[in-house]
Amino acid sequence: MNKSLQEIDKLFKKRKYNQVIKKTKKLVNSKEVIPPFYNLLGLSLAKIGKDQESEICFIEGIKKFPNEISLKSNIALIQLNLKKLKEAEKSINDALKINDKDVYTLYALGNLKRDQFKFREAIDNFKKVCEINVRFPKALMYLGQSYLDLAQETNDKQFYILAEKNLFLSSELFPENTPVDYTLSTLLNYSENNIHQKKMLDKINKLTMNDEQKYFIYFALGKSFEDQKKFEQSFQFIKLANESKNKLVDKDIIKSEILRSRNVKKIFDNIQTKISNSKLLFQKKIIFIIGLPRSGTTLLHQILASANNTYGFGESIIFTKFFENNIFNKSFLSKILERKTFEDHIVNISNEIGGKYESITDKNIFIDKMPSNFYWVGFIKLLFPNSKIIHISRNIKDNCLSIYKNMFGARDMDWSYSESNIFKFVMNYRDMMSYWKDKYQNEIYEIKYEDLVLNKEEETKKLFNFCDMDWNEKIFDFYKNVKTIRTVSVNQVKKPIYTSSIDSSSNYTKFFQHLNRLED
């Protein structure tokens, strides 16, 4: 093996991604360049959250080495992270033309099919990978998760059994692959069976794990002891999980959240809030459900999405990604703040974003439950004249406990692994919502989670009236809906409305520091 490659490969395995990036950036522009340098550079950029730079890196590599299949399969995974499904599909098809039995390409294809909600095809591809190479931990894990997706979609117990079987097999064959244990913990009730809990405890005593492996299994153990109502042990593992995860995240994330709020306020302190001809804007109704994560957005989404002629997008990135990418962009800001270009720009954005929703479904009512859309209320009102905004809130201590004890995959949730950061985020969120309520008081529908679950008929009738939708009691069968929603706790999506999470924080308040300072 090339000496430089050996050295960089060791750094990559030690997770020293910034050092890998520094070295490979020089090597890809040298005469010594070989495809693995592009792979290591692109994958390292992705590991530190720079997916767009990673994609550019792989594009450059493919131009130099058009027949290198590893570059094509790797760029496909990055494009899936960026939700560029068409581009990912093209990259995969190009790779399959080179070798239709390449395990990494088949693995990427399985992930594409999952993202397309084609779970049976995903299962077929992950099976192929496992048959070709039985030592492929992620393929077996995603085979189990695809069966879980299919179980949610069909409500067929057979697929839940197959999901558990493959996830348990993955945990046994690859004990170091602890994300499997976390997925299993969302499926199992440890008050009924503690075999997996014992295996996890045995695993943490026997294996030497890095922080990335630790936080998955610690979150899983926290959940297992909570099922058994052993709250002190549960909190010990929840705290360990958050401490392990928090070591790996951006330390300035709260500064970024506050800066985003300031920028949005500056814009709406100076911007026009309407255009002269609203008929030029996207006309279909989009219902935005906003609030803190774990506040009940999923429950609201499932209820509304069970009505006729609606399509639930879940936590869609369509709207929020556009503004996250542009809120600090000087060109974007100048166009919306300049009176001459304002109207044309707003019309273009409205129809561009609306068109992305519309390309997925022919239904007339769209539902987007991305909680962090609370940052963009002003843009929602400006861009979509027929939109509805629903703000759901929950007992703040229950809400924050639920945030603290759960693991979120998205990088924009990295603030959630520290009590102090959760407290600061809540303060920023409240400040942002107060700003919007002053501007759009009668256009934001307020609903409390506790009222919704305790008085479901009365509250949903008022909710549907606000949304100009027809109500009927069949909406309470939402949990039988075949629509698959990916959320933190997969077992909650397929349950009817329940009240057991009210006052759940009372079991943990004595262990908290910062969060006890929060009041409703």
Predicted regions span which residues?
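Phosphate-binding active sites in nucleotide-utilizing proteins
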Residues: 279-384, 392
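PAPS-dependent sulfotransferases, especially Golgi type II membrane carbohydrate sulfotransferases
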Residues: 164-166, 170, 182-185, 197-208, ...
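Structural marker of alpha-solenoid helical repeat scaffolds
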Residues: 30, 64-65, 98, 132, ...
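Position-specific recognition of the canonical hydrophobic site in helix A of tetratricopeptide repeat
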Residues: 12, 46, 73, 80, ...
